[in-house]
């Protein structure tokens, strides 16, 4: 359930420009503990840029991101440590094993026992027996699961995910949804970007459509995906 103590993520007036190109145009994002905001939209809408700004990996041209009430930035390492980020591109080092990659993330985020934390994270995503593999030897789906373990190893308060179901077969996708439901029930705040709403529909507390760098829609999840999809396509194609 949402916390009465305020949101985990509170971002206001986010703008991001590349020269004359405005990619984000005054976007507000607020997510409480136990909530999942699922974001969809057409290619080029600004979804990945939004996640990078929320994660502190890109600076907004205007606006502010606060995690647990603290502005995200170089001078706020505690706010950054509260974030887990799953990119649509691999963030793993090919010269390290999967286990070593996850241990490295645990150390960077200050885990008390990085090795044990890495083993728990790999087990949670079904990779307990693949820790000695190098990322280059993994399939796209296994690589995605390793990236999710890396993002979860430090028990973040906020998880940002960009197309996390890409490359996952049906059993692995089901396992990921079950894991995310478990973490949400324990108070995780989640922002999940997807091109395929059906993959994440059951997880969503709220759904949003980003189009042209703005929210075209942001509301509690409707009950019926089939009834929602015509609205989504009308907004995304406008």
Which role does the model predict for each range below?
Residues 40-42:
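The feature captures the beta-strand-to-loop junction immediately N-terminal to the Walker
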Residues 55:
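Helix-to-loop junction immediately C-terminal to a conserved catalytic motif
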Residues 63-71, 79:
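Conserved ABC transporter NBD signature motif
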Residues 103, 107, 113-130:
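Conserved ABC ATPase "signature" region
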Residues 155:
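Conserved catalytic motifs of ABC-family nucleotide-binding domains
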Residues 159-162:
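Catalytic Walker B motif of ABC-type/P-loop ATPase nucleotide-binding domains
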Residues 194-195:
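H-loop/switch region of ABC-family ATPase nucleotide-binding domains
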């Amino acid at each position: 359930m949402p916390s009465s103590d305020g949101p985990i993520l509170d971002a206001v007036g986010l703008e991001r420009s590349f020269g004359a190109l405005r990619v984000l145009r005054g976007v507000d994002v607020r997510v409480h503990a136990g909530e999942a905001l699922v974001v969809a939209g057409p290619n080029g809408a600004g979804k990945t840029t939004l996640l990078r700004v929320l994660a502190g990996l890109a600076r907004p041209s205007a606006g502010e991101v606060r995690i647990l009430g603290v502005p995200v930035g170089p001078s706020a390492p505690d706010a950054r440590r509260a974030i887990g980020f799953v990119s649509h591109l691999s963030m793993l080092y090919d010269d390290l094993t999967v286990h070593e990659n996850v241990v490295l993330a645990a150390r960077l985020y200050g885990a008390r026992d990085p090795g044990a934390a890495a083993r728990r994270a790999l087990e949670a995503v079904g990779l307990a027996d693949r820790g000695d593999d190098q990322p280059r030897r993994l399939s796209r789906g296994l690589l995605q699961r390793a990236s999710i373990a890396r993002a979860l190893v430090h028990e973040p308060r906020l998880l940002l995910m960009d197309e996390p179901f890409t490359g996952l077969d049906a059993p692995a996708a089901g396992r990921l949804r079950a894991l995310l439901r478990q973490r949400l029930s324990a108070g995780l705040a989640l922002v999940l970007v997807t091109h395929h709403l059906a993959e994440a529909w059951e997880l969503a507390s709220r759904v949003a459509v980003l189009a042209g760098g703005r929210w075209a829609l942001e509301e509690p999840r409707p009950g019926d995906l089939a009834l929602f999809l015509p609205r989504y396509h009308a907004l995304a194609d406008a």
